[in-house]
């Protein structure tokens, strides 16, 4: 079965304001943040695009989120308000201590093992989990304006171009590392030569 994977926080939900309010400062509260999803603003552009791809391809929608699955009631209320009817909603179990990318990767792995194929994903922070598997991603980039309001820009990322860019970046890092090592060795040789010269004198 073809699937479209959709993240919630910062992707389908334009809720960076809730993150600022509930996850920072002295009164930070994960519980209040997870419950507040029912009042989060729907990113209409993302919701419309998900429905459009689903209509064009016949793919089913799956929600894969790193948020606490203890608050499924609030999460499902939000998803319904966004106008999506996902085949599955995967939220991280409350006692799962793994980080979101690792957990999402395990969900993707199990979906693929069951014979599914993810044809597109919508993500804000964990997009590399999909790109590493060659899955096209719409990255929902959060942008804060000069008065502190959050805006979201959707950017399509081609996995082949992304992989090429990652290889190029890795090659540059390796070249820089080699040059640094060559410089260190040259410096050590020069110091050794100076020591020999001073001993000989």
What do the PLM-derived regions correspond to, one by one?
Residues 1-3, 57-60, 115-119, 135:
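Short coil/turn segments at beta-strand junctions that form active-site/ligand-binding loops
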Residues 34, 146, 151-176:
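Intrinsically disordered, low-complexity terminal extensions
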Residues 1-8, 16, 165, 171-201:
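Non-catalytic pre-domain segments flanking phosphatase-related domains
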Residues 51-55, 112, 131:
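Surface-exposed amphipathic alpha-helices with a cationic face
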Residues 74-75, 100-102, 149-155:
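Short secondary-structure transition/capping segments
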Residues 99-112:
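Donor nucleotide-activated moiety binding/catalytic core segment of transferases
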Residues 108, 116-160:
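Acidic, Mg2+-coordinating phosphoryl-transfer loop and its flanking beta/alpha structural elements
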Residues 2-98:
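Alpha-helical substrate-recognition element adjacent to the catalytic core
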